[in-house]
């Protein structure tokens, strides 16, 4: 799972057809509009993130959520369309979730949805975002090899062997 290579490939493959974009500025604003304003997690996801916070010493929900989201995007399978009950008190805006990377994460989500054959409407993007986020949290929390922050980093770096 080479996240950096994945993002480089993603950015290299995104192209916009000139005939579809008349007013580039308004098109860019529309393209970069987040699919969801407020991100709320399930209680199960909160509990899993609490475990990850303890293990990694990363104390901010949004940073762990970014790791989880990217972990799920790196998985080649489509997340199962399970209902997600957002019953925890963990909530953040899209901008808090993404920070300086919010536009890149949005592009990654859109490219993944396109690759998976999903439409790029706001509702589909929001659903796929929630599914990827929660799946990624589950993957990270369920990984017995993650016992400290270095283990989390090792997942993202290519093997040196």
PLM region spans:
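Short, positively charged interaction helices/loops
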Residues: 74-116
């Amino acid at each position: 799972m080479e996240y950096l290579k994945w993002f480089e490939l993603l950015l290299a493959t995104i192209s916009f057809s000139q005939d579809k974009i008349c007013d580039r500025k308004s098109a860019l604003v529309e393209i970069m509009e987040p699919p969801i304003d407020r991100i709320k997690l399930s209680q199960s996801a909160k509990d899993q993130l609490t475990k990850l916070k303890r293990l990694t010493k990363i104390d901010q929900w949004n940073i762990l959520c970014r790791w989880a989201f990217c972990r799920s995007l790196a998985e080649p399978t489509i997340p199962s369309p399970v209902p997600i009950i957002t019953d925890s008190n963990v909530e953040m805006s899209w901008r808090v979730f993404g920070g300086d990377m919010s536009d890149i994460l949005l592009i990654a989500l859109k490219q993944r949805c396109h690759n998976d054959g999903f439409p790029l409407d706001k509702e589909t993007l929001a659903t796929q975002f929630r599914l990827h986020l929660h799946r990624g949290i589950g993957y990270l929390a369920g990984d017995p090899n993650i016992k400290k922050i270095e283990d989390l980093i090792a997942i993202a770096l290519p093997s040196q062997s």
